[in-house]
């Protein structure tokens, strides 16, 4: 986790995102919405298409 303090003294927290290849998504990933929906069924909060081969990766906070 990265914590930043700006000039005004407020604190900003940025969480890292971990990616895991979807176990249920089949074929090339052409729709971010379809990928995210499959990731939801796997218990992840989000998912997106990534990489040269356009695979579906599920995202979660590390």
From Swiss-Prot:
Disulfide bonds join 18-62, 29-49, 35-56, 39-58. SUPFAM superfamilies: Scorpion toxin-like (SSF57095). This is Putative defensin-like protein 3. It is found in: Secreted. One of its GO terms (cellular component) is plant-type cell wall. The gene is LCR71. Belongs to the DEFL family. GO terms for biological process: defense response; defense response to fungus; killing of cells of another organism. It comes from Arabidopsis thaliana (Mouse-ear cress). Keywords: Antimicrobial, Disulfide bond, Fungicide, Plant defense, Secreted, Signal. The lineage of its organism: Eukaryota, Viridiplantae, Streptophyta, Embryophyta, Tracheophyta. Residues 1-15 form the signal peptide. PANTHER family: DEFENSIN-LIKE PROTEIN 1 (PTHR33147), DEFENSIN-LIKE PROTEIN 2-RELATED (PTHR33147:SF129).
